[in-house]
Regions:
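Aromatic-rich juxtamembrane segments at the membrane interface
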Residues: 112-231, 236-237, 474, 539, ...
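Hydrophobic alpha-helical transmembrane segments in multi-pass membrane proteins
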Residues: 4-8, 13-17, 167-323, 378-419, ...
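Core dinuclear metal-dependent hydrolase active-site scaffold
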Residues: 263-266, 366-474, 519-588, 647-667
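Membrane-interface amphipathic/re-entrant loop segments adjacent to transmembrane helices
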Residues: 312-328, 332, 340-384
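Membrane-interface helix/helix-cap signal primarily in integral membrane proteins
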Residues: 3-7, 13-178, 458-465, 471, ...
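Cap/insert and terminal regions of metallo-dependent hydrolase folds
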Residues: 499, 579-650
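Active-site metal-binding motif and surrounding structural segment of the metallo-beta-lactamase
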Residues: 440-444, 452-503, 582-599, 612-617
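Active-site environment of divalent metal-dependent phosphoester hydrolases
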Residues: 187, 223-226, 480-485, 507-510, ...
Length: 667
């Protein structure tokens, strides 16, 4: 025991231990876990672990042979509860990969949580109701929460369910969303309250541990909860056994323990945030002052510095004002709203007081200033260098640290400006259209795609941010169909746009709704234009005449990028194709964006033969109900190399020194 105590005093022991455990984790993760399903099953039995509802759509997490996530559509209320044993029939499918580069990979995310299949549920039957205390408590919390005006806050704070929280995206933008995910902060508050209440009891630490373990079970053990719970237990053991291990080394022991039991946790964003912020607060604890408000600022500043690389790695953007925002919001949420939510859950007469403070929180959140900095995707070595600079702060001159950080930031911002290539992306937005043209000076987005209840442009925006772009110079809408411009408002609300270009013809309701937003934001817009310059290239809008068919009124764009000819057809049909051939002299197209998703109403053989495209791109949804692309169209394109977003994912054409390189991001 004495030798063990002595060993635990050495810092090098923990460094070696962390390196060994990390190596072991990466080795274990390199061997992909096998699913217990083969993919052909249609009948299942399992326990309902989580239910999320949106209109007629239910997302149900089920513990069967392994955890699977089911989707179920029903206009009637679904009479199932957490913990119920159910039988259900459905079709298994693999989660979708990210087919737009540098965006959220849903398949990888689920794999890291040991979920290998999704199931589209056709029918559900309850076999037996739950007898599990854990699920009975969760069901009670859900049912009682529904009685309150702000039930979403109760569910978020008490069981970690943020799915119904309408304000969550606002909190994310302000950099304070971590306050509404059950995390180490909440466990620290609860443990502090318990230890204070039981301060005269000899068993207060043991009772606190038991309570926190039970609370963690209800919240499904998120990564940050794991970290906080183990840290609390290890610190108590360190104190009781007089091991005299430093707090930093206790944290490293916690990290090693978590990695041993679940090596995939290393890819969990919540885990990385939790550990990095905890490490920063422990290392910089000596700089804390006695003044509460100074401490609040320092805590927020340190948390910001240590979590910055993780924020940029996942989001490519950071709100510099989140340091101040946290100073304002953290006390309001952690000291008032969070404890008051728990008290109101027990004593309902406190609800008016809670509603008042939630109203104050919403008002403040809507008026917080945002200063967003976009940083392109960089090699992980840049983040390693950042942390080296950060640790230098503890040992060296502060002025040198500030200078190094300034130089480092400038390098990141200058990086996109040194890329002199031209890029054309045909983005996979399902059964819709969205194309992107950009270089180091200007950006043009042609169509946004659009899908009911899904903001497909979120991936487009995130991809743009990953390239270091902070604005779209031109948003060109080929025509007013939802699958081409349905997400335009989302783009404008979440990304700076200079000008919007409409097609010829009358505005439909969707376009009128967009124009209201443009007027409100003072964004210039034009329609029925003939020519546009993007950097050194001219884009020609091939106008012919006004058609009764909205598709034929599509903006058809012809441009020459360096020496390569590109043509974007929108949803133009055979009538417009014929008129284009009659009016314009166009041939030997290098890259054709095929009209109307490969529908038989477009891509007439005479038109294709005349323009003779070398490469043809069809933007189409996988297994779409329209049967796109049509076989006749594929036959017409027989002499062209065809790329399809349903098979190839997003397609990139990169022009570098007059050479064309093609990459796909397949499923």
């Amino acid at each position: 025991m004495i030798r063990l105590k002595t060993l635990l005093q050495y810092n090098y022991f923990y460094i070696i231990l962390v390196i060994l455990v990390l190596c072991l984790a990466f080795i274990r993760n390199s061997f992909h876990n096998e699913s217990k399903f083969n993919g052909s099953e249609t009948s299942f039995i399992g326990i309902v672990d989580e239910i999320k509802k949106s209109d007629d759509y239910y997302k149900i997490t089920i513990k069967s042979k392994e955890k699977i996530i089911g989707s179920y559509y029903s206009k009637e209320p679904l009479n199932i509860s957490l913990g119920d044993k159910i039988t259900f029939k459905g079709t298994l499918s693999k989660p979708k990969n990210n087919t737009i580069p540098n965006t959220f990979n849903y398949r990888k995310y689920l794999y890291n949580h040991h979920v290998y299949y999704l199931v589209k549920i056709d029918s559900i039957k309850v076999v037996s109701k739950t007898r599990s205390i854990k699920y009975m408590v969760k069901n009670y919390i859900v049912k009682r929460s529904e009685k309150f005006k702000h039930s979403d806050y109760f569910k978020a704070f008490l069981i970690g369910d943020k799915s119904e929280m309408d304000d969550y995206s606002l909190f994310q933008k302000n950099g304070v969303s971590h306050l509404f995910a059950i995390s180490g902060m909440h466990l620290s508050l609860l443990s502090g309250i318990i230890l204070f209440v039981l301060k005269k009891s000899r068993f207060k630490e043991i009772l606190a541990c038991i309570f926190l373990i039970l609370f963690s079970m209800i919240t499904n053990y998120s990564a940050s909860i794991y970290r906080s719970l183990l840290l609390f237990i290890y610190i108590i053991l360190n104190k009781k056994l007089d091991l005299r291990i430093s707090t930093v080394n206790v944290l490293l022991l916690v990290v090693c323990t978590l990695l041993i039991f679940n090596p995939l946790i290393i890819y969990d964003m919540g885990f990385l945030y939790s550990v990095s912020v905890s490490l920063g607060l422990i290392l910089f604890n000596k700089y804390m002052k006695k003044n509460y408000f100074v401490n609040m600022f320092l805590t927020s500043f340190i948390a910001f510095l240590f979590s910055l690389p993780i924020t940029l790695y996942y989001n490519y953007e950071v709100n510099l004002m989140q340091i101040i925002n946290n100073v304002i919001i953290v006390p309001l949420v952690s000291v008032i709203i969070y404890p008051l939510t728990i008290l109101t859950f027990v004593f309902r007469f406190l609800e008016p007081v809670l509603n008042m403070f939630i109203g104050i929180l919403k008002f403040i959140s809507n008026h917080l200033i945002m200063i967003n900095i976009i940083v392109p995707k960089v090699n992980l070595i840049f983040y390693f260098i950042y942390y080296v600079f950060l640790f230098m702060f503890l040992k060296t001159n502060r002025k040198m640290f500030i200078l190094l950080i300034f130089i480092y930031t400038m390098c990141l911002k200058v990086k996109p400006l040194l890329d002199f290539n031209t890029y054309v992306y045909f983005l996979d937005v399902g059964q819709g259209d969205s194309s992107l043209i950009y270089n180091n000076r200007e950006v043009m987005l042609i169509d946004t795609g659009g899908k009911d209840n899904i903001k497909v442009s979120d991936n487009t925006i995130k991809f743009l941010k990953s390239t270091g772009k902070s604005k779209i110079n031109y948003l060109v809408l080929t025509h007013g169909d939802f699958d081409h411009m349905g997400d335009a408002i989302n783009v404008i609300e979440n990304f700076k746009v200079d000008k919007v270009i409409f097609n010829c013809g009358k505005f439909n309701d969707l376009e009128k709704e967009l124009i209201k937003v443009l007027d409100k934001k003072n964004i210039k817009y034009y329609s029925c234009i003939k020519k546009l310059n993007i950097d050194n290239s001219k884009l020609h809008f091939l106008q012919t005449k006004e058609y009764d068919n909205e598709n034929d009124n599509s903006n058809v764009i012809y441009t020459k990028l360096n020496r390569y000819k590109f043509m974007f057809m929108g949803d133009a049909g055979v009538d417009k194709e014929k008129d284009i051939l009659d009016k314009y002299n166009i041939s030997d197209i290098d890259v054709l964006k095929v009209g109307h998703h490969g529908s038989k109403t477009s891509s007439d053989k005479n038109f294709i033969d005349e323009i003779d495209p070398k490469y043809s791109v069809i933007s189409v949804g996988k297994n779409n109900r329209y049967g796109h692309p049509n076989k006749k169209v594929l036959n017409n394109l027989d002499g062209s190399i065809i790329y399809r977003t349903d098979q190839d994912g997003s397609i990139m054409f990169k022009i570098k020194k007059n050479k064309l390189r093609i990459e796909t991001y397949s499923l």
